[in-house]
Curated annotation (Swiss-Prot):
Residues 2-199 are annotated as: Interaction with THOC7. A motif (Nuclear localization signal) lies at residues 7-10. There is a cross-link at K153 (Glycyl lysine isopeptide (Lys-Gly) (interchain with G-Cter in SUMO2)). This is THO complex subunit 5 homolog. It comes from Mus musculus (Mouse). The modification N-acetylserine is found at S2. GO terms for cellular component: cytosol; nucleus. It comes from the Eukaryota. The gene is Thoc5. Induction: Up-regulated following CSF1 stimulation. The keyword Electron transport does not apply. Residues 22-42 have a biased composition (Basic and acidic residues). Residues 1-42, 301-336 are annotated as: Disordered.
Amino acid sequence: MSSESSKKRKPKVIRSDGTPTEGKRNRSDTEQEGKYYSEEAEVDLRDPGRDYELYKYTCQELQRLMAEIQDLKSKGSKDVAIEIEERRIQSCVHFMTLKKLNRLAHIRLKKGRDQTHEAKQKVDAYHLQLQNLLYEVMHLQKEITKCLEFKSKHEEIDLVSLEEFYSEAPPSISKAEITMGDPHQQTLARLDWELEQRKRLAEKYRECLSNKEKILKEIEVKRDYLSSLQPRLNSIMQASLPVQEYLFMPFDQAHKQYETARHLPPPLYVLFVQATAYGQACDKTLSVAIEGSVDEAKALFKPPEDSQDDESDSDAEEEQTTKRRRPTLGVQLDDKRKEMLKRHPLSVLLDLKCKDNSVLHLTFYYLMNLNIMTVKAKVTTAVELITPISAGDLLSPDSVLSCLYPGDHGKKTPNPANQYQFDKVGILTLRDYVLELGHPYLWVQKLGGLHFPKEQPQQTVMPDHSQSASHMETTMKLLKTRVQSRLALHKQFASLEHGIVPVTSDCQDLFPAKVVSRLVKWVIITHEDYMELHFTKDIVEAGLAGDTNLYYLALIERGTAKLQAAVVLNPGYSSIPPVFRLCLNWKGEKTNSNDDNIRAMESEVNVCYKELCGPRPSHQLLTNQLQRLCVLLDVYLETESHDDSFEGPKEFPQEKMCLRLFRGPSRMKPFKYNHPQGFFSHR
């Protein structure tokens, strides 16, 4: 049966190639087109849910029919051909149903996409309109802000109050019936009144100028008359000199000071005479005065008989008191120490005025039993300074004059004979008493004319005027320089603590225009903290980290790179430059021991510091060194080779112009800045 049916079907396939079928195909195409358009309309009428149920049912029927055909064919009987044909026809019908459902699904999908696209276009149009409206709103807000911020010239004029305006201005200007209800007209009227008043004042000013010229002419005439009297007065004063000497009538304050100076101890007297002479000859801003009790000073030089009588009386009193109670050994030692450290009741005060109206007050004392001089210092400024945290020790009386001359820290006595005196009363060192007594600097002894030979210690040394005169000018200049440098550091530290490196206009040429690295931290640290830093060991071992120095820690950042700088500030700044030690935390920890470029950066600020001194007296050296460190960190990071294994842009793009990025086997970077060309090169 199957072979017969196949033979019957073959002619159908052959006939399909003829021309008559082409006409049929054309007609069927037109009918198909009609059906296609009818199916598009039919999509809107059909329920997708029912189509889905029909699809499931059709698939189940196809599965059932295929299973039945499979069962019938497996039986192999000859009577099942008709049943198979019927099921095949039913299957074809179901396939046509599936095709139709597929077409309907595609039509629905196309319509859904079209609707989605139309909705998206509407949303985009609305979004564009919204953005346009937002831009318009922003523009209007900016214009409104500009209008609100606009200030007219008349707003800068201080007009009289409304009460004064209506009470003093004439009705022709005030126009109260109009200006009371109109602020604009009121302002115009007040401006007219201001103009009228200024015209009147200008007229008065011209009258006052004319009167002033007349008065000046009268003053000039009287001055000429008085100047003609000056020679007569001078002759009268010259004639009265014998009378003044006869009556002992001092008219000058200097004469009184000279009288008081007679009671000064020899070292303070030498200081007073030499300082007064220096002030009169070289420095008019230096003022010299004497403080203290003259009566107590006179009591020290009583005649011996009186003193012996007093001593006998006091001995008798002491004998009576000793019978009552016996002082302990500790009390006796304390009394002996106080007596040994006793100061002379008179002291010499020097006020050294600097250019910025700051004054250095120096009070000189004389320890009578130790035969040494001490000094206490205090700095006052014309304007009260806001003391930064890191500038706490700059102007302190204990350290402001430390190491004015190298090694002269003023913590021990300059007189070798004092040590034997200290042993008798149990004083280990004078360091414990300097805050109360003052600092016995070596230059203080020289200003008093004292010189203590170390080879032959002497308890009593006579002062020498020539020694005081030879050191006076140099010491005064050093004192002024010290105060000015400390005040300059005081102001600079206030900026450094806020992350600002102040660079003056005179020093702008030392650095490129753009510096990306920035200072984020500037703090003071102790001597012990500095010695504990691992990257400062070579400074400590070299003996450059003394306890008289000041120590600071700076942190400079750019991106992920952090550069620590430990700074040693010598008391003799700026004649002695600061010393920097660096530690870079970026891709590991880098110091001068493991990175030659870090050593080169330290050399740039420590060795080549003269390029950064700026104009004399080089008070900008420290801030210029810090700014140079920021520039060096930029060069270090920008010239670092980029790892190609990491995608994306470089963290530090090269912005500095360098003639050559590396040199030598150690690949040294170009750290030298060349002005005005603006490029970096190797040294």
